Amino acid sequence: MALKLLGFNQDATCFSVISSNKGVTIYNCDPFGKCFELEKSTSNDEELDFLVEMLFSTSLIAVVDKTIGASKRKKLKIVNTKRKATICELTFPHEIMDVIMNRKIICVVLKSDQIFVYDISCMKLLRTIDVRGEKLKSTSKFRNSEAVGDIGVRVSLSTDNNSILCYSSYSKSDKENAPLNDIVVFDALKCIQINVLPAVHQSNIVCIACSPDGMLMATASEKGTIIRVFKTIDTENDEPILVNEFRRGSRPSRISEMKFNHDNTLLACVGESDTIHIFALPVTTTEADANEDDTLQQSSHSLSSSINGLQYISKGLANRFGKIIVSKIPTQSQQRHVAYIKIPENAKYRIGFPKDTTNTIHICGEDGNYLVYSIPRNEVGPCTLVKSNTFD
């Protein structure tokens, strides 16, 4: 029986999976068990394919049935899992490629590189973003194609109510090749663009992760060897700054998912390799500790330790660390992981950070394993398995 993972919800309390003989199943993480099943609508033996986006642990989910038929792939259903009833249905002009949402906003991404932004409370359309833009539409490179290869627009939405939307966009500086390597930061509630990060990678961006509060954003390109973390907005000069550069490895590997933990101190990534990498981030806060000056006198040692990923930066450095790290990155090697998890190379895995449990990461795989690991805090090393369950 084939399994296909759909992923965790926003706070890693549930995850969803497709099984060939059942359809979509949502599992609760603690206590572990099934909490919802969406049975397949056909008795045929075709391979099932769905998009499912959960809204935390609520009874609301967004579903796109992409199994068979072009018309189904254009249709979004909002389903109440308790009543097992469709409460809203929307049809779009092109195939739906992704759906993301939080408690305020739902965003639908089409194969035509359009993003539809809705108020989730009433499903009112707030904005349609045409990522390709009028200039690119007029060029011969895009006239007769719906998307560029298999690289489409990538999106990520902050899970809090600020609703910061980050999405990839075609390069404004390289109009000849037009790679998807610019990033636009968009306030989805106010429907205004608040920042643009040009050419964050040389090639197409294949994965974006927005931090829960929308203050940070991680990006990875097709090569997947380097992960970059940016501030979405610099509070002093309104320009984005590079917070960290992480080296995942030397061999190319397409990264399928990245996640920040809920206090923005860790970033995890998973892809085609046999390792889930966890990187340490500097603490960012506007509150300075009383002993900030004393801490800053020892900043050389603290910064060196943090750069090597061996400990987290103290809160006393938080206000000044953003400026320090930018000057340090160009002259130092890219940072490696502080923790890792080995996984079977032939099984796809998804990752999630629980909000209420610190120093813990959840993973689930298409081999039918749901695993909880403890992350080492004071030294580089493997994560420790603390809980395991199986699902089908």
Curated annotation (Swiss-Prot):
Keyword Protein biosynthesis: no
Bilayer topology: Peripheral membrane protein
Extent of the WD repeats: 200-240, 250-289
Motif L/FRRG motif, chain ranges: 246-250
Keywords: Autophagy, Cytoplasm, Membrane, Protein transport, Repeat, Transport, Vacuole, WD repeat
GO terms for biological process, alphabetical: autophagy; protein transport
UniProt subcellular location: Cytoplasm; Membrane; Vacuole membrane
Gene3D superfamilies noted in UniProt: YVTN repeat-like/Quinoprotein amine dehydrogenase (2.130.10.10)
Cellular-component GO terms for this entry: vacuolar membrane
Family: Belongs to the WD repeat PROPPIN family.
Domain comment in the entry: Contains a beta-propeller domain involved in specific binding to phosphatidylinositol 3,5-bisphosphate (PIP2).
Function: Required for cytoplasm to vacuole transport (Cvt) vesicles formation and mitophagy. Involved in binding of phosphatidylethanolamine to ATG8 and in recruitment of ATG8 and ATG5 to the pre-autophagosomal structure. Protects ATG8 from ARG4-mediated cleavage.
Name this protein carries in UniProt: Autophagy-related protein 21
Species per Swiss-Prot/TrEMBL record: Kluyveromyces lactis (strain ATCC 8585 / CBS 2359 / DSM 70799 / NBRC 1267 / NRRL Y-1140 / WM37) (Yeast)
